[in-house]
């Protein structure tokens, strides 16, 4: 796989796939971190004398034009970061777009309209996607993928364009993800630990199976811990649990025991009868029948933090409790704070909820790396080859 700084891009037109799927309130962007993250690649391209045609998606328009999902706000915000006007094309393919692209001069940037206004972008088969990727590729000399957030999706702009493009490469954001996540999986400094939380074991099975045996310790919190507690024969009251995965949880615990990975589960909890009010702390042997386990308790937080403090590499995905509700946020925030204050450790965070915890704690600058991917981050940690990387490797 080649990267943008390995190609001669002077005077070339770049077709750059980015992840600008940002939250909007009307036409106002409420969080522009995804746009900000791509700026270094844009600045490098412009400094080297290239022009850039930007392509991205926003929301789920389901193959139809939806005016409220136009990329106009993203084009405006990108222009503000680059100090120039970034005109928005009326579509992403077609004669008018081709004319705009042909007239683009070195040092200029234009943005294509939402790729998902065309059903072909997300169609399942190459036959259904048709020539959509070829039409996009024809707009430029070089394809640049800088969108880790969609690297796990076999969309036309991710997997078809590289095969149709004259040249292709990864941008700096994709390069960062590749290097940090690759290092975490292959050359991690030890002790190496994984911290996983969130609601469901089912969404983390791949990570559990791939990392157990590779990490020294695996901390499990959040509602997904309930399924493991049930597998140990413990009561969990009315807590969220995946009863169909109890046997799977037992298998995972057995695998950890035989492979040298120490599994850490919570032993006390903040519980409630509803998700608004905390009733207090209970330990794992005295969970109220009408109670829900909604956060790890102080003893569990202390135990988890001791494991974190002695680690050199940490990969974190998923909160320790229902952090969106203030009474049940303390476990996640405590774990976050301890990670953020480590001086000599590589700390890697991924996933929307985990990212939200870090921003809620205002500690985003204290982590080694915060991944821009949700599903991509999970699949990378599952050991899967992401479609975006496969396409770039095969066409570099």
From Swiss-Prot:
<keyword id="KW-0963">Cytoplasm</keyword>
<dbReference type="GO" id="GO:0004618">
    <property type="term" value="F:phosphoglycerate kinase activity"/>
</dbReference>
<comment type="similarity">
    <text>Belongs to the phosphoglycerate kinase family.</text>
</comment>
<keyword id="KW-0324">Glycolysis</keyword>
<dbReference type="InterPro" id="IPR015824">
    <property type="entry name" value="Phosphoglycerate_kinase_N"/>
</dbReference>
<dbReference type="GO" id="GO:0006096">
    <property type="term" value="P:glycolytic process"/>
</dbReference>
<feature type="binding site">
    <location>
        <position position="153"/>
    </location>
    <ligand>
        <name>substrate</name>
    </ligand>
</feature>
<keyword id="KW-0808">Transferase</keyword>
<feature type="binding site">
    <location>
        <position position="324"/>
    </location>
    <ligand>
        <name>ATP</name>
    </ligand>
</feature>
<feature type="binding site">
    <location>
        <begin position="57"/>
        <end position="60"/>
    </location>
    <ligand>
        <name>substrate</name>
    </ligand>
</feature>
<dbReference type="InterPro" id="IPR036043">
    <property type="entry name" value="Phosphoglycerate_kinase_sf"/>
</dbReference>
<comment type="subunit">
    <text>Monomer.</text>
</comment>
<dbReference type="InterPro" id="IPR001576">
    <property type="entry name" value="Phosphoglycerate_kinase"/>
</dbReference>
<feature type="binding site">
    <location>
        <begin position="19"/>
        <end position="21"/>
    </location>
    <ligand>
        <name>substrate</name>
    </ligand>
</feature>
<keyword id="KW-0418">Kinase</keyword>
<comment type="pathway">
    <text>Carbohydrate degradation; glycolysis; pyruvate from D-glyceraldehyde 3-phosphate: step 2/5.</text>
</comment>
<feature type="binding site">
    <location>
        <position position="116"/>
    </location>
    <ligand>
        <name>substrate</name>
    </ligand>
</feature>
<feature type="binding site">
    <location>
        <position position="204"/>
    </location>
    <ligand>
        <name>ATP</name>
    </ligand>
</feature>
<dbReference type="GO" id="GO:0043531">
    <property type="term" value="F:ADP binding"/>
</dbReference>
<feature type="binding site">
    <location>
        <begin position="351"/>
        <end position="354"/>
    </location>
    <ligand>
        <name>ATP</name>
    </ligand>
</feature>
<dbReference type="Pfam" id="PF00162">
    <property type="entry name" value="PGK"/>
</dbReference>
<dbReference type="GO" id="GO:0005829">
    <property type="term" value="C:cytosol"/>
</dbReference>
<protein>
    <recommendedName>
        <fullName>Phosphoglycerate kinase</fullName>
        <ecNumber>2.7.2.3</ecNumber>
    </recommendedName>
</protein>
<dbReference type="GO" id="GO:0005524">
    <property type="term" value="F:ATP binding"/>
</dbReference>
<keyword id="KW-0547">Nucleotide-binding</keyword>
<feature type="binding site">
    <location>
        <position position="34"/>
    </location>
    <ligand>
        <name>substrate</name>
    </ligand>
</feature>
<dbReference type="GO" id="GO:0006094">
    <property type="term" value="P:gluconeogenesis"/>
</dbReference>
<keyword id="KW-0067">ATP-binding</keyword>
């Amino acid at each position: 796989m080649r990267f943008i700084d390995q190609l001669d891009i002077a005077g070339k037109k770049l077709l750059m796939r980015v992840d600008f799927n940002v939250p909007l309130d009307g036409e106002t962007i409420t969080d522009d971190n995804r746009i900000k993250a791509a700026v270094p690649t844009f600045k490098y391209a412009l400094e080297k004398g290239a022009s850039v045609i930007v392509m991205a998606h926003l929301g789920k328009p389901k193959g139809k034009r939806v005016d409220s999902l136009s990329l106009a706000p993203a084009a405006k915000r990108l222009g503000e970061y680059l100090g120039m006007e970034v005109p928005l094309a009326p579509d992403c393919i077609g004669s008018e777009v081709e004319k705009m692209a042909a007239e683009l001069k070195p040092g200029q940037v234009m943005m294509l309209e939402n790729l998902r206004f065309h059903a072909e972008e997300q169609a399942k088969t190459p036959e259904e996607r048709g020539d959509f990727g070829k039409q996009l590729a024809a707009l430029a000399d070089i394809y640049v993928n800088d969108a880790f957030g969609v690297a796990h999706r076999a969309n036309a702009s991710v997997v078809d364009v590289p095969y149709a493009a004259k040249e292709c490469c990864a941008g700096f954001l994709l390069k960062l993800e590749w290097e940090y996540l690759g290092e975490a999986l292959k050359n991690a400094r030890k002790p190496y630990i994984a911290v996983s939380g969130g609601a469901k074991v089912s969404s983390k099975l791949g990570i559990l199976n791939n990392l157990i045996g590779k990490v020294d310790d695996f901390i499990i919190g959040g509602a997904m811990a309930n399924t493991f507690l049930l597998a140990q024969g413990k009561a969990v009251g009315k807590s969220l649990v995946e009863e169909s995965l109890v046997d799977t949880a037992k298998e995972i615990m057995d695998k950890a025991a035989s492979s040298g990975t120490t599994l850490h589960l919570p032993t006390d909890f903040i519980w409630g009868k509803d998700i608004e009010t905390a009733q207090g702390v209970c330990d794992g042997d005295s969970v109220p029948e009408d109670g829900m386990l909604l956060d790890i308790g102080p003893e569990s937080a202390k135990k988890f933090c001791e494991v974190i403090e002695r680690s050199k590499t940490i990969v974190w995905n998923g909160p320790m409790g229902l952090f969106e509700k203030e009474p049940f946020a303390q476990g996640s925030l405590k774990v976050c704070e301890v990670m953020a204050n480590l001086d000599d450790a590589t700390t890697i965070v991924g996933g929307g909820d985990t990212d939200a915890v870090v921003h809620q704690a205002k500690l985003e600058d204290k982590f080694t790396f915060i991944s821009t991917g949700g599903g991509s981050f999970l699949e990378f940690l599952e050991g899967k080859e992401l479609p975006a990387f496969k396409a770039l490797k095969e066409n570099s």
